[in-house]
A protein has these predicted regions:
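Membrane-embedded alpha-helical bundles that constitute the cytochrome b-like, heme-associated redox core
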Residues: 2-200
């Protein structure tokens, strides 16, 4: 008798654990910088910008479909989480910019970087929902290719977020926080661009 083997995937909710651990590491580096600069520990307003960036990084990397991930996890479930986190992240980033509206206006890089990041990620999220979600894709006029290119504005959002934090004097001088932030951001963006050309 032939038996059909069903592949058992690991829990997709591991993603939330990875995001939590990554966020705690980055928050730790940030607070280290604040304490070294003589500032009190803990600032939830900054976290409303940093944690969404951590989410962007993790989900953008997983969207490249690394082999270690695809061999253990269900991609369909991953994209469901991807969409939900995309919506939540846009909302939190909008709240972050609202909290810092007056202060960010004093910095050209901080102001424009923040709003370019929000706009780019917002468009990337909407395009992903409209053109790349299986159920919605059937009723949209534009094709999958258009959706993919618009969704790549996510990379623009990551670069804009990096420019955003360089606009604030205190954070821009933090070591090792800022170098780590820069390396992760541009490392991932370059890797994604490399994969884009590799597939051609």
């Amino acid at each position: 008798m032939n038996q059909v083997e069903t592949k058992q995937h690991k829990s997709i909710y591991h993603i939330f654990i990875w995001i939590a651990v990554f966020s705690l590491i980055m928050i730790g580096l940030l607070e280290w910088g604040y304490i070294a600069g003589g500032r009190a520990f803990g600032n939830y307003k900054v976290y409303t910008g940093l944690v969404p960036w951590c989410v962007w990084i993790v989900m953008t990397y997983l969207a490249t479909r690394p082999k270690w991930f695809t061999s253990r996890y269900n991609l369909v479930d991953m994209y469901k989480v991807h969409r939900a986190l995309g919506i939540a992240t846009v909302a939190v980033i909008a709240f972050h910019l609202y909290l810092y509206f007056g202060k960010a206006a004093k910095s050209i890089l901080g102001w424009w970087g923040g709003y370019v990041a929000l706009t780019s990620f917002g468009i990337a999220t909407i395009s992903g929902l409209a053109f790349l979600t299986p159920k919605l894709r059937k009723v949209t006029a534009s094709g999958r290719t258009t959706g993919i290119w618009l969704h790549r504005l996510n990379l623009v959002a990551l670069v804009a977020a990096d420019i955003h934090i360089h606009g604030f004097t205190r954070i821009s001088k933090m070591v090792p926080f800022l170098p780590v932030f820069d390396i992760i951001t541009y490392g991932l963006v370059i890797y994604c661009i490399y994969l884009m050309f590799k597939k051609k």
